[in-house]
Amino acid sequence: MEKSVNHNEVLEKVVEFDQNIYDIQDIDILLEHILSEIRKIVKADAGSIYVVEDKNLVIKYAQNDTQLRELQPGEKLPYKSFSFPINEKSIAGYVAYTGKPLVIDDAYNIPEELPYKFNKQTDLTTNYRTKSIYTIPLKMPDGKIVGVLQIINALDENGKIRSFSIQDGIYINHFATNCEQALKQT
């Protein structure tokens, strides 16, 4: 019974969010808000939104609760604006290239035969450990890919990293639609 109560509470939050989302006019604030909300709903530690610019993916929005807690007052997260090509080599690039979502249980154990790889350098640079990843393309109604939503490290009730569930995927897909609608306005 507790799961259905939790599910109902989450649905109420989603509906409330959807009712208030269009009051936000600033695209940057809106996308940051969407990213923050989906991370809360699926209990994910981190996430990013990438936007397509000149055949590359550019990270525009990044959030990471673990790293945020470790910052000294006045410090900012160590993310720099960076871009990489849309191709099959990276996880986000693969999703933008193929238009298909990817759900990865352990970023460090991706089978060798797959074309995409996890870039461990980001974890090394930021002293973080990425494990579970849910990456979904952001598409316009005509099918054009305009970005990628990536949610990282789903957490269980004890704060341990877990795989993303089917239910998480439903919520992430819903919020990806919100991102698409926001990007459509730009």
Predicted segments — roles?
Residues K144, G159-K184:
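Amphipathic alpha-helical "output/dimerization" segments
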Residues K131-M140:
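A short, aliphatic-rich beta-strand micro-motif
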Residues D18-Y22, I34-K43, I49-V51, K76, ...:
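Short regulatory alpha-helical segment in sensory/regulatory domains of signaling proteins that mediates
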Residues S36, S48-N87, N109-I110, Y116, ...:
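GAF sensory/regulatory domain recognition
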Residues K139-I145, A154, T186:
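Flexible loop/coil segments at beta-strand boundaries within sensory signal-transduction domains
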Residues M1-H33, K40-I41, I59-Y61, A182-Q185:
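Signal-transmission linkers at sensory-effector interfaces
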Residues G93-L102, Y108-E112:
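Soluble sensory domains of the PAS superfamily and closely related sensory modules
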Residues D105-S132, L155-R162:
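Signal-transducing coupling segments at domain and membrane junctions
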